[in-house]
Every structure is written in C-alpha cells, then in structure tokens.
Amino acid sequence: MDVSDLLDGLNDKQREAVAAPRSNLLVLAGAGSGKTRVLVHRIAWLLGVENCSPYSIMAVTFTNKAAAEMRHRIEQLIGTSQGGMWIGTFHGLAHRLLRAHHLDANLPQDFQILDSEDQMRLLKRLIKAMNLDEKQWPARQAMWYINGKKDEGLRPKHIESYGNPVEQTWLRIYQAYQEACDRAGLVDFAELLLRAHELWLNKPHILNHYRERFTNILVDEFQDTNNIQYAWIRMLAGESGKVIIVGDDDQSIYGWRGAQVENIQRFLNDFHGAQTIRLEQNYRSTNNILKAANALIANNNGRLGKELWTDGSDGEPISIYCAFNELDEARFVVNRIKVWMENGGALNDCAILYRSNAQSRVLEEALLQTSMPYRIYGGMRFFERQEIKDSLAYLRLIANRNDDAAFERVVNTPTRGIGDRTLDVVRQTARERQLTLWQTARVLLQEKALAGRAASALQRFTELVDSLAQETSEMPLHVQTDRVIKDSGLWLMYEQEKGEKGQARIENLEELVNATRQYSYQDEDEDLMPLQAFLSHAALEAGEGQADKWQDAVQLMTMHAAKGLEFRQVFIVGMEEGMFPSQMSLEEGGRLEEERRLAYVGVTRAMQKLTLTYAETRRLYGKEVYHRPSRFVGELPEECVEEVRLRASVSRPVNHQRMGTPVTQNDSGFALGQRVRHAKFGEGTIVNLEGSGDHSRLQVAFQGQGIKWLVAAYAKLETV
C-alpha cells in the first residue's frame, strides 16, 4: 500500500502517531483534534505498511456505533474487507470471549445478558425475599454497590465488612444476587468484564493464546476506563504486547460511574517505554472558543498538559447573558435562535446544553410557545422502551426458560390472572428448592399445589411459551419475532391503548420486527442460534441511543450527552454556583475538577458561536433561590467574552409572566427608560419590568456595572 495514501492530509503530529514504531504509545488527543482519523489510519498503517495480520489487531471503543464506524472507515481506506480483527466495546469483546469459552468461564452456552432494568427487577425481588425493608435497602443502591464492587474486581468473598452491619447486609444482597444469576445463567454488564478477567486469571493457557494473537492493541477514550477494564488490557498485553491508547484527561467526565482518569498516568508508569504524542491542533472551533477552553481547564491540577490551537479565525467573542430568572433565560435563548434562523441558520446546528435534565422543562415550554421544533437528545432509548422490553423478554424466555428476569416481566403481561399471591408462592418455593422460577412453576403445576384459577392461568402461560418455542424454532428470525409479538397478546394489548402513545408503541413493535429482519450475524456470533445472537446484540445496544431521523430541530441535551458531538451554535444555560458546578460537587472533595472538565467538554462542542447564560434567581424545590454566577464564567479570559446588554432604546421589553407581552410601566412607580441611581451600582436606565406589588422587579443597565435585576421594594432606587 502507498504510504502517502495514509499520511496525506494529516498534520505533523497526526503523522507521527500514525507512523510511530510499534511500541507502547499514549496519544493525548484534545477535543476536535481528529483522534478517530488517527486511530483509523494507524490500523490501516499496521495492515498495509507493517504487514500485520488482521488477526493480530484488537481495537476497543466505548460505543458500538464508534466500533462500526471504525471498521467501515478502515475498510474504505484499505479498499478490502478485513476479517479477523476484533473491534468493539469492552463489554462486547468480553461477551465474545465468554461465548467462545463459556465452559471455562463456568457459564451455560445459552447464557443471557441482564441489562440494568432487569437487574433492578431481580434485586427488588431478592430484597423482598430476604425480608429487608425496601426503603432502607433500595434496589437501585444495591445495583450501584454490586456493579461498583465488580468494577473493582471484587467478589463477596474478597470484601471485608469489618463487623459493619450495613456492609454485611449489602454483602448478603450481593451474594444472593450472584447466586440467583448463576442459577438462571444470567450475566450483567459488570459481570461480563469481571468474568472475562477471571477467565484469564484462572486459565493461563487461554490468556496465552490471546496474548500470542493480539500483539497490536488500540484503546480509545482511555480516560473513561475503570479498574477492571485497565486490568483486563494490562493482563492481555503482558510484557510483549504493543498498546496504543488514545485519551484526553481533560475530558474525563464519568468518575461517578467508576471511570479512573488516573489510568492514563498508570499506563505511562506500567507500560515499559511508553511515549506520548500530543494532538493539539483543533479542527472544530474558533480561536476565541479555544482560548476560553484552555483558560478554563488550566485551573485544574495534575493535568498532563496540552494547549488547543487552530489556524482558523478568532471568530465571535463568547456571549455571556445574565438573566433575571429561568424564564428570562429561556426567552433569551429562544430569541437568539430566532435571529439565527432569520439569518439562514439551521435549527439542528443549534444545541442547548444543561447540567441536569430537570433544566429542560422551561426551555421546552419556551420553544413550544414559539412553535420551534426541538429534540431531546439521548431520551428514551429504543431497546429500553416498555413494549420492546416486553417483547424481548418473551424472546428471551423462549431461548432460555430459566431466565428469571424475563419470566417475572411477562408472566402476567398481558394480564392473565396470575396475581402477586401466586407469584409469591412461586418465588418462595424457588428459594426453598433452589430452582428457577420456570422450573418451580412446572413443579407446582405437577404437584397441584396452586389454587384452581391461578393454576389454570399459570398452565396457559407455560403452554404458550412452550408452543411458541416449538412452532417458531425453524422460522426466520423476523417471522419468529412477529409471531411471538402477536401470539403473546402484546400487539393487541398495545393496540387497545389507543391515542398517540398506543400508536407509538405499535410503531416501535413494527420497528423491532424490522430490526430482526435487518440484523446480520457478526463473525463472533457464528456459534449462536439467530435468536440468541440477536438477544445478545439487543442487550449490548440497550445502553446506546437509537437516533430518530434527523430533522431540522433545536437539540437539547445534558453536557454528558453532548460529549463527542459538535454544533455551529451552542448555548450553555444555568451557569450558576450550585447548578454548575453542582451543589454536590461543591460539598464533596475532588468533584469540582470533574465539573470543570464537564464545562470544558461543553465549551468545546461549539464550532462558531458560544453563549453562556446564568440566572440571578431560579425556582428550585418550590422556592426562588438566588445564585452567584458560576466560577467557570469568571475563569474565562476577558478578551474572549462579551456581556450581552439589552438595547438602550428598550423598545422591546418582556413580561416574564406572559412571554413576549410588552410592559412599559407597573405599580412599582417606575417606568421603562427611566434613569435611576443605586447606592452601590450608581446610575442606570430601567430596561425591563416584571411582576407587581411587593414582587415587582426592575432590570437596570448600570454604567460600568452591567445589567442587574433588583426587587423594587428593597432596592432603594432614586430617580435622576
């Protein structure tokens, strides 16, 4: 392959990373620096220039979408399909490994993946069965505890309670949960990684096989790896494996779910002779945006250090707007987007970012009032929707009768007269006899241990599942799926729901059938039946959003959801102390720097225009709370920002009670355009009025002090 084909169009540092000798390497890649391109060209370099076998390459990404895109781009660059490479997420690759060695991993061949919702259901049932107070020992907290311990590589036997009764109870729940999973052949996401790691620990011959095979390992988004993922990669590499990691310590924003930004430094310490190449040239943002991002993140300690730059223009200054409250903030953002549209801009080039989902409501209302289409990015995902979960549960039960989570979900869906009392008997008997729920149901029916009506209903359910399994086993996957949805009664149940919601559910069921029709085997699924392969695919995809057809609509999302995206115009709202950085980060040591990294991620999403807004007052928990501007606003260099001021003519005032309705005077005794004097801020002009009586508020543009909102009853303003 011609070397120039792989290096043309790359900058000097990108070329250096692509053509680096085969050794351990950290590519410290700043936002918008073309890291994906570097990874793709590096793999193509290994194949086309170094003549490495595709079978020697493992590439780890953090989403299935990124893995599919990487494989596609490599094949486009090389010009041929490259089978044999392992490209996927940590969970996907661990799943592939466990499927190939299920006996050595002490798993049944048809083991099923338990997603977070099913994990929660199982834990709720176990906590109830253990006679624990579900409020004191919530299933969500138990899930967090168990997953956290697994991410650290810890089984119950490895955890010391030190006589702490709280820790002892969590350990009991962990133990009971794991025993239930083992009985039913269920593996949760954290278990995939832990068991894959244990497989290599306990079976050195298997580890050695993969060490000899995968001599070229590449890992993307390394700042987001947790302890077990780091240990997994380190064990696979051994002493002779060559590992390239790509990451950015300044974009590590998932510490709350176990990510260890320190893993980048651990890599430099643990992997012999590891070198560092910095990608600092940015191809996304203007110079002003990059200067602001650099200044912001420079306030964090312990960084590996890099300075983003561009050979593009300075662009517009970053706009900062001080709103009176969240209503004013939303109005301002919507009006700015209107101006963008009037100047020929597309709505889908505009993104509104916020720290938490709760902030979206007021923004949505403002957009609705102006009939401006919008989309909540990262909303309910396809495989997490109720009707899809129900359908998959039937399919899972057909594939594996011992799947307790699937049994629990559909045994009375649609309603068929199997009540909680009957299910409690089944659960209790299952615990006593150490059986799965399906096995227990069959035993109780054989022993005639259930009341007549309940027994009949349970009998009909087991016969339904058995008949569906038998009659559809030879059908194409999409025909099988359609048959199960119809014969189980799910289609009719949701069809009877009527209205837009019912129609949406039916459309989703149709889309599930389409998904099974379009599903194609991956090479790692060659030993699985079609249904088992698709169920594994669905479980692995459940954590990733299914994008709707892209429309011209404003994009609303949290800053976490925005990572990896870019927009021409970005608004970051709620830039207030206690909102962003969050109150929790201010109260807990070590969290503030991750909040600043999150702000850095938000700022670097903007390509052309960035606007930051904060409100002086915001209604929280039913009360109006006063906030100071976020420290992150104060950390931006003055030469890169501009404060947005209302026009001096005050020709278009706004009443925040009825957005868009002009108000020129209220019962406060003040009027728009009036000159006033304040003891602290000096002279200014009233540019806005809001409220009435004791709640009357004034927005005043002070000379040299900016725009301030004041409560008329307390401001002690003098007319000039």
Summary of predicted features, one role per range:
Residues 56-145, 150, 157-162, 321, ...:
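Conserved P-loop NTPase-based nucleic-acid remodeling module centered on helicase motor cores
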Residues 3, 8-19, 23-28, 38-39, ...:
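Conserved helicase NTPase motor core
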Residues 34-35:
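Conserved glycine(s) of the Walker
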Residues 2-7, 39, 44-48, 227-329, ...:
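Conserved RecA-like helicase ATPase core segment
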Residues 1, 240, 562-579, 584-587, ...:
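Structural signature of nuclease core domains in nucleic-acid processing machines
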Residues 3, 7-10, 15-28, 55, ...:
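Inter-lobe coupling/hinge region of RecA-like P-loop helicase motors
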Residues 53-64, 85, 220, 246, ...:
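Conserved RecA-like ASCE P-loop NTPase motor core of nucleic-acid helicases/translocases
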Residues 159, 163, 346, 360-372, ...:
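Conserved helicase C-terminal RecA-like lobe
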